[in-house]
C-alpha cells in the first residue's frame, strides 16, 4: 500500500459495506485505475491490501491507489452489468485484459435487390444491412469461405459503387467466379437461386445441396445437355471437397467452447465457435489478468469478452472449469443480449468432443506463447543489462510523410508481454514546415507527454539530432525521461544501428545481440504503424482535395459522389449527364462540378 495514502485507505476499508456492488480504484490525480465487482464489497476490496499478494500486476495496482469509491447494487448480476458498462466507458488501464480486441469477422449477404453481394467485414450489422453469418476467428478464414462461395455459386463480391459502373464483365467473370449480373449475363431468378444456395451453404445445409446437384446433373445428362451436366458435376466435386475438409458434427446447434490454462505466469484462453453443427475455427487469447483461481479468471475473461468485444453470444457456452458466479453471468448475458444463455462445464458426447478439441488447442497455443514469452523476456533482460536499469514499458516514436505531405507521428508501446496495440497512438502533425522531421517529433512528444505517464524507456528513431530535440521537449515539460536515440548504420543495413544516450555516449551492439533485436522489433513496428496511418491519410486527402475546392459541395455529397463512381478517377471521367444521376446532386451542381473539374 502507498504509505502516503495508508490512513485514508484504512478509514475507507473500515467503513465498507458487505453488500454487492462495484468498486473503483483511483490514482493520485483522481484517475481511474481499475473497476471491479464484488459479492461482498468489504471482503473483496480488503483482499487487495493483505501482505500475501504475490501477483506483480496486483502489487503495481495497489502501489498506485490513493482513493477508493464504491457503488452498491441490488444483486451480483447488476454489479456485473455496471462493472462492464464502466469499463467500456472509461477503459481503466488495469482492466485491459485483451491485447487484441478487434471485432470478429462476419460474412454477410447484402439486402441489395435484385443482385445482392456477399462480402465480409468486422462487427455484425454496423455498416451493412442483410444476413450475417459467423463469427469467423480471422479475416483469413472468412476470405477462404468467400473464395469457396465464389467458385461454387458465382455470386458477386464487388462494392456497389464498382458494380454500378460496369459496362462489360470483369476478370472475376472470365475466371468463372462471378456470373456478371452487372451487365445482365444472368437472370434475376437464376441469380436469386445462387444467392439462396450460398445462404444454405453458410447455414451448414450442404447435405441437401449435395442431393440437389446430383439430381440436376442426372437430369441434364438425361436431357442430353452435357455442358450443363459437366457444370453441375464440377460444382458437386468442389462441394464434396469442401465437406471433406470441414469438421461437421451430428448436433445441429450453436455454441462457443472456452478452455483456459495457466503456466509460468502466462494465461491462455482458447475460444472455438460452432454454428449449425460446423466448427468455424477458433482463436487464442493471452489476457493480462489479476487472480489465481482459474474459474474466476475465466469468468472475468468471459464478461470482458462478451460485453466489450463480441457482437453476439450463442445459446450455449461450454467451459473447461466450473465458474463460481455462473448463474450471475448467465443472467447478465441474458439481459445484455435478450436471449437465454447456458454455461456448462460438465458435458457428454459431441459437446465433450468440442471441449476436448478446445483443450488440445489451448495447450498447443500456450506452448508457442511460452516460447515467444521466454524469448521476449530474454530480450528485455539483455536490454536491461545494456542500459543498466529495469525496463517494463518501452515507447517508440517515428515520423512518416511523402515529401512533407500528410505527416503522421506514431507512438507504439511494448512491455514484457509484447506489443500493447491498444496503447498505440498516432498524431496528425499540423502547422509545421513541410518535411521538418524535428518539428514533427517535437509536436508529437509534447502532445503525448503533457498528460501521459513516461515509459521506462523512450526510443527515438533518428539518432543524435532527434534525441537532442527530445531532450529539449522533456526539459520544457519539466520531465526526466530515460531516452535512447537509434540511428541507422551505413546503407541503412539492419544490425549496424548505433544507440545514442543523453549523456553523449554511444554504443553499437553486436548484430546477434538480443537487446538489439528488441530495439529493432520496436522501431520497425513504429515505422510500420506510422507509414500505414500516413498512407491512409495521404490517399484520403488526395481523393477528396479536388472536390473540396468546389463551392456548395459538402462532406456528405462528396462522399456520395466518390461512392457512386468508385473514387476520384471515376468522378473525373464522368460526363455532366452521368453526374446528375447521383442522388441529391441536381443539374446545377452537376454542371458546376463538371465545369470546375474540366477547366
Curated annotation (Swiss-Prot):
Domain called GIY-YIG: residue spans: 18-96
SMART domains, per database record: GIYc, HhH1
Record localization: Cytoplasm
Family, as annotated: Belongs to the UvrC family.
Gene Ontology BP, a term: SOS response
The protein's role, per its UniProt record: The UvrABC repair system catalyzes the recognition and processing of DNA lesions. UvrC both incises the 5' and 3' sides of the lesion. The N-terminal half is responsible for the 3' incision and the C-terminal half is responsible for the 5' incision.
GO terms, molecular function: DNA binding; excinuclease ABC activity
HAMAP family: UvrC
Subunit structure as annotated in this protein's UniProt entry: Interacts with UvrB in an incision complex.
SUPFAM superfamilies given in the database record: C-terminal UvrC-binding domain of UvrB, GIY-YIG endonuclease, RuvA domain 2-like
Name of the protein in its database record: UvrABC system protein C
NCBIfam families named in the record: uvrC
Keyword line: Cytoplasm, DNA damage, DNA excision, DNA repair, Excision nuclease, SOS response
Top-level taxon of the source organism: Bacteria
Source organism of this protein record: Acinetobacter baumannii (strain SDF)
UVR domain span: 207-242
A Gene Ontology cellular-component term: cytoplasm
Pfam families named among the record's database cross-references: GIY-YIG, HHH_5, UVR, UvrC_RNaseH, UvrC_RNaseH_dom
Amino acid at each position: 500500500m502507498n504509505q502516503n495514502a495508508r490512513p485514508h485507505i484504512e478509514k475507507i476499508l473500515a467503513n465498507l459495506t458487505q453488500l454487492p456492488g462495484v468498486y473503483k480504484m483511483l490514482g493520485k490525480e483522481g484517475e481511474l485505475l481499475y473497476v471491479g465487482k464484488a459479492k461482498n464489497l468489504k471482503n473483496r476490496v480488503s483482499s487487495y491490501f493483505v501482505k500475501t499478494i504475490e501477483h506483480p500486476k496486483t502489487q503495481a495496482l495497489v502501489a498506485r491507489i490513493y482513493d477508493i469509491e464504491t457503488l452498491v447494487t441490488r444483486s451480483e448480476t447488476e454489479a456485473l452489468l455496471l462493472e462492464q458498462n464502466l469499463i467500456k466507458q472509461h477503459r481503466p488501464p488495469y482492466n485491459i485484459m485483451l491485447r487484441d480486441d478487434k471485432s470478429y469477422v462476419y460474412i454477410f449477404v447484402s439486402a441489395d435487390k435484385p443482385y445482392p453481394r456477399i462480402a465480409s467485414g468486422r462487427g455484425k450489422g454496423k455498416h451493412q444491412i442483410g444476413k450475417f453469418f459467423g463469427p469467423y476467428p480471422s479475416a483469413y478464414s472468412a476470405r477462404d469461405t468467400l473464395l469457396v462461395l465464389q467458385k461454387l455459386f458465382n455470386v458477386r463480391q464487388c462494392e456497389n459503387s464498382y458494380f454500378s459502373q460496369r459496362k462489360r464483365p470483369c476478370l472475376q467473370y472470365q475466371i468463372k467466379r462471378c456470373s456478371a449480373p452487372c451487365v445482365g449475363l444472368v437472370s434475376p431468378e437464376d441469380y436469386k437461386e445462387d444467392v439462396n444456395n450460398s445462404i444454405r451453404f453458410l447455414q451448414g445445409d450442404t447435405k441437401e445441396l449435395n442431393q440437389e446437384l446430383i439430381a440436376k446433373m442426372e437430369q441434364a445428362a438425361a436431357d442430353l445437355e452435357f455442358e450443363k451436366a459437366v457444370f453441375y458435376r464440377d460444382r458437386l466435386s468442389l462441394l464434396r471437397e469442401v465437406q471433406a475438409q470441414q469438421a461437421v458434427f451430428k448436433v445441429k446447434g450453436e455454441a462457443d467452447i472456452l478452455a483456459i490454462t495457466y503456466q509460468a505466469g502466462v494465461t491462455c484462453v482458447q475460444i472455438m465457435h460452432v454454428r449449425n453443427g460446423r466448427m468455424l475455427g477458433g482463436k487464442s487469447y493471452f489476457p493480462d489478468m489479476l487472480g489465481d483461481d482459474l474459474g474466476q479468471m475465466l469468468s472475468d475473461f468471459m464478461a470482458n469478452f462478451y460485453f466489450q468485444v463480441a457482437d453476439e453470444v450463442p445459446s450455449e457456452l461450454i467451459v473447461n472449469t466450473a465458474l463460481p458466479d455462473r448463474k450471475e453471468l448467465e443472467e447478465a448475458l441474458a439481459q445484455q443480449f435478450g436471449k437465454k444463455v447456458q454455461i456448462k462445464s460438465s458435458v457428454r458426447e459431441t459437446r465433450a468432443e468440442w471441449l476436448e478439441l478446445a483443450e488440445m488447442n489451448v495447450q498447443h497455443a500456450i506452448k508457442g506463447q511460452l516460447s515467444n514469452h521466454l524469448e521476449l523476456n530474454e530480450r528485455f533482460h539483455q536490454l536491461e543489462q545494456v542500459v543498466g536499469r529495469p525496463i517494463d514499458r518501452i515507447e517508440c516514436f517515428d515520423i512518416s510523410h511523402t515529401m512533407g505531405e500528410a505527416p503522421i507521428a506514431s507512438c507504439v508501446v511494448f512491455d514484457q508481454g509484447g506489443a500493447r496495440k491498444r496503447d498505440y497512438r498516432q498524431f496528425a502533425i499540423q502547422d509545421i514546415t513541410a518535411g521538418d522531421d524535428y518539428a514533427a517529433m517535437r509536436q508529437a512528444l509534447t502532445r503525448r507527454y503533457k498528460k501521459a505517464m513516461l515509459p521506462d524507456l523512450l526510443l527515438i528513431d533518428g539518432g543524435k539530432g532527434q534525441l537532442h530535440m527530445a531532450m529539449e521537449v522533456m526539459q520544457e515539460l519539466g520531465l526526466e525521461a530515460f531516452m535512447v536515440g537509434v540511428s541507422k548504420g551505413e546503407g541503412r543495413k539492419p544490425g549496424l544501428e548505433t544507440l545514442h544516450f543523453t549523456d553523449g555516449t554511444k554504443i553499437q551492439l553486436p548484430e546477434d545481440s538480443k537487446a538489439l533485436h528488441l530495439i529493432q522489433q520496436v522501431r520497425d513496428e513504429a515505422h510500420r504503424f506510422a507509414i500505414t496511418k500516413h498512407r491512409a491519410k495521404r490517399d484520403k486527402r488526395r481523393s477528396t482535395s479536388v472536390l473540396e475546392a468546389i463551392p456548395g459541395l459538402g462532406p456528405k455529397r462528396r462522399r456520395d459522389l466518390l461512392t457512386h463512381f468508385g473514387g476520384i478517377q471515376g468522378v473525373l471521367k464522368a460526363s455532366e449527364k452521368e453526374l446528375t444521376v447521383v442522388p441529391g446532386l441536381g443539374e446545377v451542381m452537376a454542371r458546376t462540378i463538371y465545369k470546375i473539374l474540366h477547366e
